[in-house]
Curated annotation (Swiss-Prot):
This is Alpha-neurotoxin NTX-1. Residues 1-21 form the signal peptide. The keyword 4Fe-4S does not apply. InterPro entries: Snake_3FTx (IPR003571), Snake_toxin-like_sf (IPR045860), Snake_toxin_con_site (IPR018354), Toxin_cobra-type (IPR054131). Binds to muscle nicotinic acetylcholine receptor (nAChR) and inhibit acetylcholine from binding to the receptor, thereby impairing neuromuscular transmission. PROSITE patterns: SNAKE_TOXIN. Expressed by the venom gland. Keywords: Acetylcholine receptor inhibiting toxin, Disulfide bond, Ion channel impairing toxin, Neurotoxin, Postsynaptic neurotoxin, Secreted, Signal, Toxin. It comes from the Eukaryota. Disulfide bonds join 24-45, 38-62, 64-75, 76-81. GO terms for cellular component: extracellular region. Belongs to the three-finger toxin family. Short-chain subfamily. Type I alpha-neurotoxin sub-subfamily. It comes from Naja sputatrix. The keyword Signal applies.
Length: 83
């Protein structure tokens, strides 16, 4: 009986994937690609892009922030989906 309960507990933990952390790219513009683990149960990655006096700019990270007019943002929900 104990073995069955232990097996059910392990299966539950594996199925629920307790402790899962979303991983997002966090490099800016044309920097070497890097990733970060998102904190606080964050469920989105974002890629924000705009043009300024320095040229075309890109920012990546965790979350899905609000942006001003003229800034394009793409939000997604899977690991490293914001490249």
């Amino acid at each position: 009986m104990k073995t069955l309960l232990l097996t059910l507990l392990v299966v539950t933990i594996v199925c629920l994937d307790l402790g899962y952390t979303l991983e997002c790219h966090n490099q800016q513009s044309s920097e070497t690609p890097t990733t970060t683990g998102c904190s606080g149960g964050e469920t989105n990655c974002y890629k924000k892009s705009w043009r300024d006096h320095r040229g075309y700019r890109i920012e990546r990270g965790c979350g899905c922030p609000s942006v001003k007019k003229g800034i394009e943002i793409n939000c997604c929900t899977t690991d490293r989906c914001n490249n």
